[in-house]
Amino acid sequence: MSIVFSDRFRYTLVVSSYKERIFLKHSLIRFSAVVLTIAFVFALTGCGSGSNSFTWFVDCIPANLDPQVASASADVIACENLYSGLVRKDPSGKYEPALCERWEKSSDGLTYTFYLKDGLTYTAAKGNATDYAITAEDFVFAFRRLFRAETNSPYAVEFAALENSAAVLAGQMPESALGVTASGPLTLVFHLSSADDNFLEKLTLPGAMPCDEEFFNSTRGTYGLNASSSLSSGSFYIYNWTASGLFLRRAPSDSLIDSLRLVQNTNSAGQSAAELIANEKCSAAPDDTAAPTTLTSLSYSDTTWSLLFNCSSVFASTELRQALASAARGAAEVPDGGLYAAANGLVPDGLTVDGMNYRDTAGDVTPAAVDARALYLTARQTLTTSDFNKVSLMVPAGSGVTSAAEEINGVWQKEFSLFFSVEEVDEETFAKRLAEGDYTIALAPISAEGGSVYNMLNQFTAAGGGLTGYADSLYATQLQASTQATGSSRCRLLGDCERQLLNDAVAVPLFAQQKRLLIAPGIQNLIFDPFGPVLDLAYTTKE
């Protein structure tokens, strides 16, 4: 079973084989696209209220089903099952038509022409048919919405290669200048300013789903915010949407899952993932323990525990950070319990950027060996003993990393005669102080939200939250440049940023935290995104 993590909003875990089901707006169907790439094939069993139902616990009930803006995990899960796009991937990773009959790509890679299927329409709530046909104009309107500043779409960055996209987003050119045009009701043409080898991959993202302009305008600002202002072009339709959950259905067909329940775990909060599945409270569940289980499990990692130095404190000194970082690397053993592994960088192994393995493309980011003692002595020339009086190493209680923090602290005492306290605080306090910069050193979990390398690195910029108070114009410039690049160029720019963070000892990656999805036997053809988490049940069956 191979795992590939994507630098977008999902990664797909494909269980068994696909069988596409597509539903009917003004003239086409849209298959709920898989937004990230991690392809697996395995079997799962769903539990729920019906014989062919699937229940998934969400942190919060879906609130926004507008595919051009959906980014919260529950919203993306819903969009995954409500909408279809131009193309989709089969289990082998090959792209195949979804709402289109076929497509053509120019020899220079700058023009893509899609020929849409005829006669497809959107489906309203309760499975009611509509007269809204899916046409090429729906895709034109959807992409124009992506590049409206007021939309604030998280997907715009993925389509930076579209002709005039930056100028349209900045308001310097009209929407009509965007490189997406309709040549008739069923012919859609994309014009790129630079070739993007992963353009088809990006067309599986929610933001690339069709949007009927007439229907959108009729909702008067409530598009995707309630059942009556939403239309389905994918596998499922909205059956009910209340404060209790979002309930999706489709017409029964053999062993296909025909009911998807997105609800909160309100009555079984004390049960483990394995217990929830065994007690038929849910059909699959993420698990962050290493407890033995007979259930099928899928392991992955999106989090790296790292030492963080607050650059607004005494650790504004790069030499001091580098000295302590050098001594800390390898000082702590990987915590027991099976949840952790030694980190190879800040970005977890397995993530991809534009379909490319990030780590393989970006290369090794391990800082070169340094003379830690010499760096420390250089730093001390501008520091006094009193500068270290309030330094502590903050860790979250119950995380299992306190012993590692104490080992590192012991090495600093031995190597530099620095006596810091290890400060263990509850999880809520830890998160609050980290966000407010109220710490000097912290051993903290740094996550790649949505499986995105960019999102992970952006946390170290002022615009992204200023996690450590690090302010470097080169870092910010290169990270911003990565949003305009694609493929290997994007990987290299992101790799340079990661390398700079580690060389400057802003963050010192220590342990990759392992997670897993637990699944009960019997469910097949499930597409799973551990970073959302996102589930696509278009082809999921229950034996």
Language model segments and positions:
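Alpha-helical secondary-structure segments
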Residues: 137, 189, 302-353, 389-401, ...
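Extracellular/periplasmic solute-recognition and catalytic clefts
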Residues: 239-249, 258-312, 334-335
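Extracytoplasmic/peripheral linker and loop segments enriched in polar/acidic and small residues
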Residues: 419-430, 455-521, 543
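Aromatic- and charge-enriched surface segment that lines or borders ligand/interaction sites
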Residues: 102-158, 315-316
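Structural transition elements
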Residues: 338-381, 398-403
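Gly/Pro-rich hinge or "lid" segments in bacterial periplasmic/extracellular proteins
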Residues: 173-177, 184-186, 191-264
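N-terminal lobe/hinge region of extracytoplasmic solute-binding protein
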Residues: 57-107, 151, 231-232
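Long beta-strand-rich cores associated with HINT superfamily self-processing modules
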Residues: 517-543
